[in-house]
From Swiss-Prot:
Organism: Leptolyngbya boryana (Plectonema boryanum)
Transmembrane intervals: none
Gene name for this UniProt entry: pip
Gene Ontology MF terms: aminopeptidase activity
GO biological process: proteolysis
Record's protein name: Probable proline iminopeptidase
Length: 321
């Protein structure tokens, strides 16, 4: 099993204005002359953490992390205005141009895989390779599975806590019920809903429930952005034109070397989506981790991701891995 690379600090960081309203935090670490890779975090609304730098050999990669609109250190915090998938795709291009990078590798898991696909299908000429994990295509059935009826059969205990802020008469549409509370002007209503929404995902993200992950997801500031922005995207169906847009447009990226890492027992983003993506991208490499759930910190997923980044960085730019 592979282990994380040693912890490193960024060699440069900054705030990049991307609209009159939004400014995003970004950072660079590793080798300034290495192969560039942009890390797209999950959620949406999850933000970046220092550990994400450690999935890449710092002597060979130029590692770019940034907080998407409303998340992490980006401002304004938890802002829903001017916050859509296509705003984020535009921000990625603005960041690439700001850093004078012609083409780069794209790494993303969960919602980060959604955004990676949306970005690469919009700008395929800018992508050298894709490393995707815990595939989320933001189709209606995926949303219903996790937030309405499906994952609840596997985690009925945690599901009860998720239900608590919503009265029984509103539970036929949990996304809408949560959205009303997460956009409430009442801070207490908003906070209660944000924590319940966020902790539900934190509880279900690993094959073996991790209490430390639950406490992270219960943090007030994290939960506020995470829950509000997620629910905003999901009630708007990801701002996609069709339910399976990301699968329909796979022909645009069929030539891009792609690795898909998927936990067999991922409850948050079930393997059916990774399987559908792999079939739509038959040249992709699908790695199924047999003893893992959703989290990129689970040993088998972590090992497969680091192995993939090592293989990518060792190959010539246009070569398959």
């Amino acid at each position: 099993m592979r282990q994380l690379y040693p912890a490193i600090a960024p060699y440069q960081s900054g705030m990049l204005p991307v609209s009159a309203l939004h400014t995003i935090y970004y950072e660079q670490s590793g080798n300034p002359n290495g192969k560039p890779v942009v890390f797209l975090h999950g959620g949406p609304g999850g933000g970046t953490i220092p550990t994400y730098r450690q999935y890449f050999d710092p002597s060979k990669w130029r590692i770019i992390l940034f907080d998407q609109r409303g998340a992490g250190k980006s401002t304004p915090h938890a802002e829903l205005r001017e916050n859509t998938t296509w705003d984020l795709v535009s921000d990625i291009e603005k960041l690439r141009s700001h850093l004078n990078i012609d083409r780069w590798f794209v790494f993303g898991g969960s919602w980060g895989s959604t955004l990676s696909l949306a970005y690469s299908q919009t700008h395929p000429d800018r992508c050298l390779g894709l490393i995707l994990r815990g595939i989320f295509l933001l189709r209606r059935k995926e949303i219903l599975w996790f937030y309405q009826d499906g994952a609840s059969w596997i985690f009925p205990d945690a599901w009860e806590h998720y239900l608590e802020p919503i009265p029984p008469e509103e539970r036929d549409d949990m996304i809408s019920a949560y959205y009303r509370r997460l956009t409430s002007k009442d801070a207490e209503i908003r906070s209660t809903a944000a924590k319940a929404w966020s902790v539900w995902e934190g509880t279900t993200s690993r094959l073996i429930v991790d209490p430390s992950l639950q406490s992270k997801f219960a943090d007030d500031e994290f939960a506020d952005a995470f829950a509000r922005i997620e629910c905003h995207y999901f009630i708007n169906r990801g701002f996609f034109e069709t339910d399976d847009q990301l699968l329909q447009n796979c022909d645009r990226i069929a030539h891009i070397p792609t690795v898909i890492v998927q936990g067999r027992y991922d409850v948050v983003c079930p393997m059916t989506s990774a399987w559908a993506l792999h079939k739509a991208l038959p040249e992709s490499e699908l790695i199924v981790v047999p003893d893992a759930g959703h989290s990129m910190m689970e040993a088998g997923i972590l090992s497969a991701l680091i192995d993939a980044t090592d293989r990518f960085v060792a190959q010539k730019t246009n070569g398959k891995i």
